[in-house]
Curated annotation (Swiss-Prot):
<dbReference type="InterPro" id="IPR023753">
    <property type="entry name" value="FAD/NAD-binding_dom"/>
</dbReference>
<comment type="similarity">
    <text>Belongs to the NADH dehydrogenase family.</text>
</comment>
<dbReference type="GO" id="GO:0016491">
    <property type="term" value="F:oxidoreductase activity"/>
</dbReference>
<dbReference type="GO" id="GO:0005509">
    <property type="term" value="F:calcium ion binding"/>
</dbReference>
<keyword id="KW-0809">Transit peptide</keyword>
<keyword id="KW-0496">Mitochondrion</keyword>
<keyword id="KW-0274">FAD</keyword>
<feature type="binding site">
    <location>
        <begin position="57"/>
        <end position="87"/>
    </location>
    <ligand>
        <name>FAD</name>
    </ligand>
</feature>
<dbReference type="GO" id="GO:0005743">
    <property type="term" value="C:mitochondrial inner membrane"/>
</dbReference>
<keyword id="KW-0285">Flavoprotein</keyword>
<keyword id="KW-0479">Metal-binding</keyword>
<keyword id="KW-0560">Oxidoreductase</keyword>
<comment type="function">
    <text>Calcium-dependent NAD(P)H dehydrogenase. Binds calcium ions. Alternative NADH-ubiquinone oxidoreductase which catalyzes the oxidation of mitochondrial NADH does not translocate protons across the inner mitochondrial membrane.</text>
</comment>
<dbReference type="GO" id="GO:0005777">
    <property type="term" value="C:peroxisome"/>
</dbReference>
<dbReference type="Pfam" id="PF07992">
    <property type="entry name" value="Pyr_redox_2"/>
</dbReference>
<keyword id="KW-0520">NAD</keyword>
<dbReference type="InterPro" id="IPR045024">
    <property type="entry name" value="NDH-2"/>
</dbReference>
Amino acid sequence: MRGFTYLSKVLHSHSSYSKLLVLCSVSTGGLLVYAESNVESGKQVVEQNQPESKKKRVVVLGTGWGGTSFLKDVDISSYDVQVVSPRNYFAFTPLLPSVTCGTVEARSIVEPVRNIIKKRSGEIQFWEAECLKIDPVNRTVSCRSGINDNLAGHNDFSLQYDYLVVAVGAQVNTFNTPGVMEHCHFLKEVEDAQRIRRTVIDCFEKSVIPGLSEEERRTNLHFVIVGGGPTGVEFAAELHDYVYEDLVKIYPSVKDFVKITVIQSGDHILNTFDERISSFAEQKFQRDGIEVSTGCRVTSVSDHFINMKVKSTGKHVEVPYGMVVWSTGVGTRPFVKDFMEQVGQEKRRILATDEWLRVKGCSNVYALGDCASVDQHKVMEDISTIFEAADKDDSGTLSVEEFRDVLEDIIIRYPQVDLYLKNKHLLEAKDLFRDSEGNEREEVDIEGFKLALSHVDSQMKSLPATAQVAAQQGTYLARCLNRWDQCKSNPEGPRRFKSSGRHEFLPFEYRHLGQFAPLGGDQAAAELPGDWVSMGHSTQWLWYSVYASKQVSWRTRYLVVGDWVRRYIFGRDSSRI
């Protein structure tokens, strides 16, 4: 007892160094004590009106996966970091489908940006505002606050930068399909998930009103998901569980009218996954009564009907619906389009960067995540330059030894070469020099070298628009900036084939750590490195553990796990809030 009294006095006298959180568990009578230390809190928060810093200024646009991972790793002792985002929180977007049905609450998957900044001793400045324009010539960004206009002060401001990190994500791409913006729900933001949740309840409440015909009830309870990718499939699975585990118990009179349909333009859902997972998902959806319409393209959406074209027959079909969720396509934000025009990328669909995440056409601007794509160099475009650099004796032929000396740099600069060698089971450089009949060759001329590498570029793959890619890019860029001076004097990248010397940094290399597809009924599918595929109930528990561990803070980790436990015990809430 004396020890507890002493501890209480210590905590009370040093409140700036620790927090005490006491959580009483009603169901078990247990007591959990959680102490969060803050050894850095003695430092003063940097004020906005501080004297001008001699440090280079890095302006970060966005607080998604790319921006947040960058903020967590960048060396703030070397850079003056300033963040601009229209939302003052980071959202764990892979759990948005769970938010739509109340499996997880919205506040459980968000972490305030200022909490993240606080852990960096408060030396990062944040402004809740939207970027309107990037001026790469004068190195400024124009911003506007969306906070209540009735409050005093102006809303527009601009920031100068030495380095700009564009990590604003993407908006929905409707492919100019008529009626999509007016009548469809999307699933990109937390607010989208909350609107979907309210609409689902609206559909059920409207369907139990007296006097409606059976046809009207069926229409109201027909939920259509456009897009058979991971987001669409996971939402369909979550919705199915929500309906048949919770809602039919409180709306028993309309349980027979519920229908869930997934419309996919391709031949299979989850077509970016292993074929075994795609097949497993389709079979499970069939057992669950979820209709999967593959080979169909939506042509328009009206207030009560969705029109689609069946590719195999060319017929147009009109389908009544109660709610449509559009979960396909990645679009570019307006100010990013304007920026692309300024840097000569107006003909591209998405912002292009090089392998070091530098935006092409301008200097000191980097782009991460869904708003950009890495434009990889093709080997065949540089084949002559590579040959000349490797031919040290200027003999006009390339020996196996000469090629072996530059192969490591080639693989780093052109990762598709490594993929080609592995896929063709070519273990050594000499294997690549074999002629069409399989005979070994000690040397090749330029034409033979072109022939040897002619199929390499077919291995090039664009990076998927996932949280995993954006997070790795943010970490990579932060580490590059942290080691800027060191790598400028001692380059660590591959050799420059078009000039002398070496690149300062290694190019970004994405490491695929696997992907999950929750399929409802406490079953999931996973595709993990090493061609390992797992499906079933055990995979769902693996999904729980991985997603809990990937939360950005202990606070959100506790809240998410608590929501999962609450759902198991009490079910999902059906209140329209």
